[in-house]
């Protein structure tokens, strides 16, 4: 199968391309950009006028609903939605039900995604058991099962000693820690940005400092433990 995609805006950061060019595909692989390969005859031509042609996008925090939330959506439906939007790779936070804190659960998710054979799924293992912020998980075993990093999803670790040990352990093995910076006590019960609108609507506000203080703490611990963070 040979496909000619014409008139699209080609964006390819790796090769420093951002221009209106044609793309030529053969046997599922890009055979040429800008100029057709010798002897290329397309079986299908796609007019991509006013559209962007680019490598598959990566969603760094995609709730895939499985396991535990199939009443909302399924892994298959979420992956289909991702592909329809040009997202071909999905990083999955560990706040499923059950939490991704056991190798068997990670292997099950990876196997299910492989069976569906649509988007690539990259699980993030739980940084602490049950995301409770008390006991760090067996990161090495989770990594071997397929986790590409470790996260607390949207749940902050209140005990900085636990966070320190978790980041220190991750640094030892070169694992990346993904954290949402939020000072839990300042943000407690908040539902909106702390400001005029929240006050007018009678909503409990979250001050900006809830994020900046958490960022400062995370960066300081990262500096001391020499760990790699994504926030």
Positions of PLM-derived features:
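Metal-associated gating/positioning segment near the N- to mid-region
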Residues: 51-113
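Active-site mouth loops of central-metabolism enzymes
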Residues: 60-73, 122-135, 154, 204-206
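Alpha-helix-loop-beta-strand connector modules within alpha/beta enzyme cores
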Residues: 103-120, 168-179
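Divalent metal-coordination and catalytic microenvironments
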Residues: 8, 23, 28, 50, ...
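N-terminal metal-binding scaffold of metallo-dependent hydrolase/deaminase domains
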Residues: 1-41
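Gly-rich Lys/Arg/Thr-decorated short loops/hinges at beta-loop-alpha junctions or inter-strand turns
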Residues: 59-62, 87-92, 118-122, 194-203
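Active-site metal-binding motif and surrounding structural segment of the metallo-beta-lactamase
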Residues: 36-53
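Histidine/acidic residue-rich metal-binding segments in metalloenzymes
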Residues: 134-228
């Amino acid at each position: 199968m040979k496909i000619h995609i014409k008139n699209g805006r080609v964006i390819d950061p790796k090769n420093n391309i951002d221009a209106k060019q044609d793309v030529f595909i053969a046997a599922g692989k890009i055979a040429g950009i800008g100029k057709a390969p010798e002897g290329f005859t397309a079986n299908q031509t796609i007019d991509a006028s006013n559209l962007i042609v680019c490598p598959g996008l990566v969603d760094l925090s995609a709730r895939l609903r499985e396991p535990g939330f199939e009443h909302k959506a399924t892994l298959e439906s979420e992956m289909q939605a991702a592909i329809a939007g040009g997202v071909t790779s999905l990083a999955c936070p560990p706040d499923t039900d059950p939490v991704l804190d056991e190798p068997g659960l990670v292997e099950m998710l990876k196997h299910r995604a492989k069976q569906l054979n649509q988007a690539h799924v990259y699980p993030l293992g739980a940084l602490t058991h049950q995301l409770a912020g008390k006991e760090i998980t067996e990161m090495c075993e989770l990594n071997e099962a397929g986790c590409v990093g470790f996260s607390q999803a949207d749940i902050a670790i209140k005990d900085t000693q636990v966070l320190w040990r978790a980041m220190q352990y991750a640094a030892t093995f070169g694992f990346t820690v993904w954290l949402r910076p939020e000072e839990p006590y300042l943000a407690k019960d908040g539902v909106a940005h702390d400001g005029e609108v929240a006050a007018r609507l009678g909503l409990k506000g979250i001050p900006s400092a809830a994020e900046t203080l958490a960022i400062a703490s995370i960066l300081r611990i990262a500096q001391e433990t020499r760990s790699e963070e994504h926030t």
